[in-house]
Amino acid sequence: MKNLNVNKNSVISRLINNYLLSHKFTIFFALIMMIISAGATGLHAWLVQPALDEVLIKGNKEMLLLIPIAIIIVTLCKGLATYAHSFQMSKVAHSVIAKLQTQMFEKLMYLNLNYFNDSKSGNLISRLINDTYYLRLAIVKSVTAVIKDILVIVFLLGNMFYQSWSLTLFAFFAFPLAIWPIKKIGKSIRKITYEIQNEIAKFSNVLAESIKGIRQVKAYNREEYEKKRAFATINFIKKFFIRSAFVSNRLSPLMEFIGSLAVAVSIYAGGVFVLNESMSTGQFMSFLVSLLLAYQPVKALGNLNISVQEGLAGAERIFSLLDTSLEKLEKHENSKNIKLKGNIKFSDVNFSYTGQKVLNNINLSIECGKKAAFVGLSGSGKSTLINLLLRFYDNYSGEISIDQKDIKSLSLFDLRENISLITQETLLFNESILDNIRYGNMSCSDKKIEEIAEISGVSKFANELPGKLNTIVGESGIKLSGGQRQRIAIARALIKNAPILIMDEATSSLDNLIEKEIQLALDELMKDKTTIIIAHRLSTIQNADVIFTLEKGSIESKGTHEFLLKNSAVYKKLQLQEDANAH
């Protein structure tokens, strides 16, 4: 609820200045169409008077022909104008929402990892989809209602005053009574909608987790648990929607009552005027038709506040994302197309996360083209070193340099363009094998990808698939085995051909047999590259040029496999654990 203190006027002003004004010509054209549509409604009401007075009472045969023709022409003009302004305003709304969604997605792509660590994916997805949905409705309804419905009321009021100004004052005496409850209901709806959107975000998160982790759910027989978790959120959403309906639906009977008062007073007073011959029957009926036609736009303006408040609640959540602190944004300077060799050095590097020391006075160097491995117990800081080298986090002390260049002096694009990363969990997109490999180098030709697929061993299994390299892998590569996904990851890194290669427990999820099968592909990948390996199994790093052992965020020892077996307590412990697990 903390974001509800955002100033409503500032949100509206921002929407108008930053998003709606760029469509001012389209909105102006729609406004002209609204004037025509509203004027046609007023003309419909006015035509009742000559239809009664001139045709039915006076028997004017010329008017008998003209009035039906006039009604057809007015109706046609109204229909065309209504279509035009409705289409144009929908186009504006969709354009505004597309711009907001583009800005939000761009913002998400450039936020640092800290932001994602503190956020739930369902909440972020909800802002992009649900909040923009509410705002889209608000833009279409509010602009159309505020302009068109007010214009309709103005034209109808004009006809009512034309027929009888005194009767008009009688008819509208009760409408000011509706202002306070409309305002009160609107505020309540805004608060409830904000809660609904938060709960929908939670539900999106539960849904995403349950579907993504469906194998774990089934393996642990947790279907009932996930049902309870989802049902609890669904019930919260249901309660908020019921509250919203309870509050918003109060407005309808209120407007019905006020409308009936206006009609009752008008019929009584108008009847008196007609009986006193101060008003003709045609004038009274024209007045009454105008009053009845005015009821719907007046009611729509009352309900409009509900749509506006729902849209504002969505806009607040959208802008809270767009206004994320600059401290949480990665700084993407322009690329200078720097090509690095791969001499890496950490000098007095310290790093804390959420107040806890993670790395303590790290000093190390890795020569260009050498293979370095990092081992240690879980939580010793191995992956954190990689995160700092890739500048996923910048709030460390000390210096990290590549080729004697402080990595903070490099643009993020240049730095990361010189590094290939293979992780334990291979991210594959729901596209073809070919496109998933191309992700490493978007300008690469199909022929080059086919060559890389052969080298990495991807072709070995792809050729057995119906679509070969054009086979769709499924969401997160679900249609492939772990070894097959890892081969694609290797191919992706090969095609990027960066001078620095990082393998963060890249083969830890594979069994020994599969690991040996892809070792040739890995050897090809590591050739002539500075390679950093975060190791799970010591057997995979015995040929490393240097191995660093980490303990509680500090380097305990470094050396070759043989040296560490004799001199490192941490390394000995890890070797004993591996030997025990092998038996």
What kind of region is each of these model predictions?
Residues 337-583:
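ABC-type nucleotide-binding domain
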Residues 17, 25-46, 67, 71, ...:
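Alpha-helical segments in transporter systems
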Residues 1-41, 56-67, 85-89, 93, ...:
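Membrane-integrated ABC transporters
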Residues 11-12, 20, 85, 89-90, ...:
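Juxtamembrane loop-to-helix connectors within ABC transporter transmembrane domains
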Residues 24, 113-114, 130-139, 143, ...:
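An intracellular "coupling" helix at the cytosolic face of ABC transporter transmembrane type-1 domains
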